[in-house]
């Protein structure tokens, strides 16, 4: 639920609040690829590009990351958001 709320806030451009919720979600689910991807997105939109790339790279290393998400993450690592 925390991730979902954070993602809603992200999509309505409330990036700082989104980052806070997504950070909390990451603490609850540290190996969830979607949560870490969303947190990376929020970091990027808050001007923390280096940290965002760290989390996106981490998503690529998780065993349960699906191929479609890996492709999206690789694009983000090249182009950003």
What are these regions (language model features)?
Residues 4, 38, 72-76:
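Canonical tetratricopeptide repeat
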């Amino acid at each position: 639920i925390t991730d979902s709320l954070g993602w809603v806030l992200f999509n309505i451009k409330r990036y700082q609040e989104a980052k806070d919720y997504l950070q909390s979600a990451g603490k609850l689910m540290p190996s969830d690829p979607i949560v870490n991807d969303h947190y990376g997105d929020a970091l990027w939109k808050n001007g923390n590009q280096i940290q965002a790339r760290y989390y996106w790279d981490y998503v690529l290393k998780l065993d349960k990351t699906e191929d479609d998400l890996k492709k999206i993450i690789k694009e983000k690592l090249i182009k950003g958001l």
